[in-house]
Amino acid sequence: MPKLSVIVPTFNRQVLLEKAIKSIQNQDFKDLEIIVSDDNSSDDTKSVVQNLQKDDDRIKYFLNQNYKQGPNGNKNNGLDQASGEFVTFLDDDDELLSGALSTLMQKANEGYAHVFGNCLIEKEGNLSKEFSGKGLEKDSEISKKDFLMAKFSGEFFSVFKKSLLENKRFNEEFYGNEATLWVNLYKEKSFYIHKAFRIYRIFRQDSVTLGASKNAYRVYLGYLELAKILENELRMSKDKDYKKTCASYYKMAAYYAKLAKNYKALYKCLFKSLSIKINAPALILLILSIIPNNMIEKLSKIRVALCKN
């Protein structure tokens, strides 16, 4: 049994997929398997993988036949096939930096069930020195509360014990919102290394925003689930620090409910947010709830642009 399973979910990216796999093969950490989970690609993905398999029997190819097509179902397919004690995911359009896996696994061997680091952003072919993960500035242990309070955000790269997930999987009804599964990674000791381990490629800066808008109801479901997780934590721990974040998640659920034109869910989540903690964003959204969606999206883009400047 390999120590580490590297899962590479893929769909119609045969050229970039080969680069991703080779970046794994070039790692100095060798006790691993490479699980390629193909979401029924229509290009030559399978042939690319088969050619690489000729010289490396650690590479395994699995067609996603048991889950719905889509990022979450494809990742679940990969998880089902992983046999390593530890697991990590590498997107098919990303690459690992030299020494990434050995550094993370060395820290894991010190008794950490979850170790993660940062990524370098590559925008439209230009590699920058900018980290994709925000909020963490030094090597440190990370608690479940840090995660739930959203003290850090963005793209990171991690290795974790597969046992932390037990039999839990990504919810196929959600669009994104992986945090509903990642919360399980903080059951045991977690450690963050303030260093880049992966190249995170962004081809269109607005692609995530556009995707979220087109799948607004599924994004709403994810935020609603996150809010419920926070509310349960608040109820169990009596820690008032959770109130602000919990209210914020209900507000985000309300925002996407509006984009999905589900007004019953919109007002239910807004009033839930305000009942937990009176907050300006929820009040503003309540006022804006009568404004058409296309205007809300334009105002949101203006706000993001102003925050960057």
From Swiss-Prot:
Further facts: N-linked protein glycosylation in C.jejuni consists in the transfer of a heptasaccharide (GalNAc-alpha1,4-GalNAc-alpha1,4-(Glcbeta1,3)-GalNAc-alpha1,4-GalNAc-alpha1,4-GalNAc-alpha1,3-bacillosamine) from a membrane-anchored undecaprenylpyrophosphate (Und-PP)-linked donor to the Asn side chain of proteins at the Asn-X-Ser/Thr motif.
GO biological process: protein N-linked glycosylation via asparagine
Record-listed E.C. numbers: 2.4.1.293
Single GO molecular function: glucosyltransferase activity
Keyword Transferase assigned: yes
Record membrane topology: Single-pass membrane protein
Role description: Glucosyltransferase that adds he final branching glucose to complete the final heptasaccharide structure in the N-linked protein glycosylation pathway.
Compartments (UniProt record): Membrane
Family of the protein in this entry: Belongs to the glycosyltransferase 2 family.
Disruption phenotype: Loss of the glucose branch in N-glycans. N-glycans however contain the entire 6-mer, demonstrating that Glc plays no role in determining the length of the GalNAc backbone. Cells show levels of colonization of chick cells similar to those of the wild type.
Keyword Glycosyltransferase belongs to the record: yes
Gene behind this protein: pglI
CDD domains named in the record: Glyco_tranf_GTA_type
InterPro entries xref list: Glyco_trans_2-like, Nucleotide-diphossugar_trans
Transmembrane segments: 273-291
PANTHER family named in the record: GLYCOSYLTRANSFERASE (PTHR22916), UDP-GLCNAC:BETAGAL BETA-1,3-N-ACETYLGLUCOSAMINYLTRANSFERASE-LIKE PROTEIN 1 (PTHR22916:SF3)
Protein's pathway: Protein modification; protein glycosylation
Cited SUPFAM superfamilies: Nucleotide-diphospho-sugar transferases
Name by which UniProt lists this protein: GalNAc(5)-diNAcBac-PP-undecaprenol beta-1,3-glucosyltransferase
Keywords attached to this entry: Glycosyltransferase, Membrane, Transferase, Transmembrane, Transmembrane helix
Domain of life: Bacteria
Residue pairs linked by disulfide bridges in the UniProt entry: none
Catalysed reactions, semicolon-separated: [alpha-D-GalNAc-(1->4)]4-alpha-D-GalNAc-(1->3)-alpha-D-diNAcBac-tri-trans,hepta-cis-undecaprenyl diphosphate + UDP-alpha-D-glucose = [alpha-D-GalNAc-(1->4)]2-[beta-D-Glc-(1->3)]-[alpha-D-GalNAc-(1->4)]2-alpha-D-GalNAc-(1->3)-alpha-D-diNAcBac-tri-trans,hepta-cis-undecaprenyl diphosphate + UDP + H(+)
